[in-house]
From Swiss-Prot:
Segments forming a coiled coil: none
Residues modified by glycosylation: 79
Name of this chain's protein: Transmembrane protein 107
Pfam families in UniProt: TMEM107
Effect on the protein upon substituting residue 45 to G: In OFD16; does not affect subcellular location at ciliary transition zone
GO cellular component: ciliary transition zone; membrane; MKS complex
The protein's role, per its UniProt record: Plays a role in cilia formation and embryonic patterning. Requires for normal Sonic hedgehog (Shh) signaling in the neural tube and acts in combination with GLI2 and GLI3 to pattern ventral and intermediate neuronal cell types. During ciliogenesis regulates the ciliary transition zone localization of some MKS complex proteins.
Entry membrane topology: Multi-pass membrane protein
Disease note: Meckel syndrome 13: A form of Meckel syndrome, a disorder characterized by a combination of renal cysts and variably associated features including developmental anomalies of the central nervous system (typically encephalocele), hepatic ductal dysplasia and cysts, and polydactyly.
Family matches, as InterPro entries: TMEM107 (IPR029248)
Length: 140
């Protein structure tokens, strides 16, 4: 159990790091929205890109809620497979989203980061919910 106990704080810290970067992106999304648009754009085009990015970030926050609920309730806290998936995904997301903010990547890039770094661990977390509560099996 010694190796698993080291995964718990690592998972929590990478999850929070990813959450902080997503919240930072909410605050500073203007430069990324402008990077998605041509040099001359209309306010309608700007608003459309803004709504798309806000929707993507909102879905990401919803998936954070799912993952934090599973983690903090203990459903997946000591599951080493879920911990490794979560650590890898959220660590990658923290780095990739930092580049997304500072390098002003296009908005379509966010969807790739979203699928591999937010949706994947959330789907595996929901599978653990089904396993634990639906099938009444131990999570580890």
């Amino acid at each position: 159990m010694g190796r698993v106990s080291g995964l718990v704080p690592s998972r929590f810290l990478t999850l929070l790091a990813h959450l902080v970067v997503v919240i930072t992106l909410f605050w500073s999304r203007d430069s990324n929205i402008q990077a998605c648009l041509p040099l001359t754009f209309t306010p309608e085009e700007y608003d459309k890109q803004d709504i798309q990015l806000v929707a993507a970030l909102s879905v990401t926050l919803g998936l954070f809620a799912v993952e934090l609920a599973g983690f903090l309730s203990g459903v997946s806290m000591f599951n080493s497979t879920q911990s490794l998936i979560s650590i890898g995904a959220h660590c990658s997301a923290s780095v990739a989203l930092s580049f997304f903010i500072f390098e002003r990547w296009e908005c379509t890039t966010y969807w790739y980061i979203f699928v591999f770094c937010s949706a994947l661990p959330a789907v595996t977390e929901m599978a653990l919910f089904v396993t634990v509560f639906g099938l009444k099996k131990k999570p580890f």
